[in-house]
Amino acid sequence: MTKATPPTLAAGALLWRNVEGDAIEIALVHRPRYDDWTLPKGKLEAGEHLIECAAREVREETGAIARFGPLLGQVSYDVEGEPKNVTYWAARAVEMHEPTAESDEIGRVQWLSPGAARAVLTYGHDIEVLNSFLKIGTGTLPIVLLRHAKAVKRSDWDGDDDDDRPLDSRGEIQAQRLRSTLRAYGPLEIHSSDANRCQQTASLLSDKFAAPIITESSLSEYSYKRDSEAALSRIKQLLQLERPLVICSHRPVLPHLARALLENTHLDTPTASLEPAAAWVIHARGGVVIAIDYLSAPE
């Protein structure tokens, strides 16, 4: 039996910008090779996270440095008989530079109203991405519920206090890679459990975002066991700050934090546990959660 060809993985964004009032414009790119109008996207490079790929391709093809918002989904289609999967996010242009893509790859960038973009887009799957974006809307802020990077196993730790258990060598690499992954969401305020493995993870992010670490003792694993209501009350307070945040905590605690944030929404509560350095990204507008995404751990 012939093995199925694995799909080519790619990522991109529905890139938008504010214009007058509440109006927005969408970026479309023209590809001379195909003579089509599409959304900025490109193939995944070795060792690259999908959201990193999307941010890089947006920068190369449009010149925009973007702040990423909700995941809009994945589209699949064939290119010259080979399968391709493209993952898209919403992304707001916050700074513009000259595109760096070759002119035979991207010939032109055009900013259009959503209605005009729908009429110009060549492919139906791009229109579906646009529709998903319009359904969610703009003005969201992320809260990244992050599990700390990989730590030394409890069975291998001979310290007296489990809160002192550090990252292992793999976890240190993961924490460094998280800086590139989470950069797509823009500058983030960092809140962390007081456990050493969380503080180490947060410290590497703090260096990248030039942000202080705000220690949240109520969000540690053992504090949650003693007083779960304090942790749940605190995460709801953090939601009302209406600022982009990273909350670094623990596998047993994070599902409860997510459930508290998703109360009174139509969204499904995550059921699977997060692996080290993975996250759920909550997107909120006006202190109300409107979307939740899964963000896999960096390689």
Where do the protein language model's features map onto the residues?
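N-terminal strand-loop-strand
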Residues: 2-39, 143-148
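Short, well-ordered beta-strand micro-motif
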Residues: 15, 30, 88-92, 111, ...
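Short, solvent-exposed aromatic-acidic interface loops
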Residues: 29-34, 293-299
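Active-site-proximal alpha-helix that buttresses catalytic centers in soluble enzyme cores
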Residues: 42, 47, 53, 139-226, ...
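Non-catalytic terminal regions with compositionally biased, polar/charged low complexity
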Residues: 126-128, 132, 140, 259, ...
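Active-site-adjacent alpha-helix immediately C-terminal to a catalytic or transition-state-stabilizing loop
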Residues: 232-290
